[in-house]
Amino acid sequence: QHSMVKFSLIIPCYNEASGIPALFERCQEVFQSPEYEVILVDNGSTDHTQTLLAELLFKQPIIRTICLNTNIGYGKGILAGLESAQGDVLAWTHADLQTDPQDVLEGFKLFSQTRNLQKSYIKGLRYGRSIPDFFFAVCMSCFETLLFRKLLWDINAQPNVFSRTFYDSWVDPPHDF
């Protein structure tokens, strides 16, 4: 059976039980078409995140979960979700709703309008940060730009949206982001 999923959003969750109901509700509001899937990766939570995900899961066919028994790092949670994703366009973001799922949807739409889908990478941009946080982001951006010889800005901003082809080309992706 051919999957209708075009867009996959991966959201790693670690001890996010207090925020899971709001995250789940917001994802239900934003992603209503079968061309979207949301993969919540319980990354070895020690609170009741996994139980909450199981209780809420039956309410929405677009949302599914992956449960890892032990926390193996944020990056491993992302990679577990990416490996399971069915979409041609992939994304990830944080579970704490610092990035609204609507912003991810806008990222998916923007990505779909780019000319070279295989080489495009959509990245969020954070506004209104404290001066120390902004200064740290500037320093990290300078370091990353020098290291990779490509202009990079605020590498930790969310969401991240890219093609399956881009993901498949990763020879040795980092295991922690």
Language-model segments: residues:
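Active-site acidic short loop of glycosyltransferases
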Residues: V5, S33, Q60, A85-D88
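Donor nucleotide-sugar binding loop of glycosyltransferases
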Residues: E16-G19, S45, Y74, D100
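Short, well-formed alpha-helical segments that are part of the catalytic scaffolds
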Residues: E16-V30
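Acidic helix N-cap motif at the loop->helix transition within catalytic regions
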Residues: S18-A22, D47-L56
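Conserved donor nucleotide-binding strand/loop of the catalytic core
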Residues: Y36-I39, Q50-S84
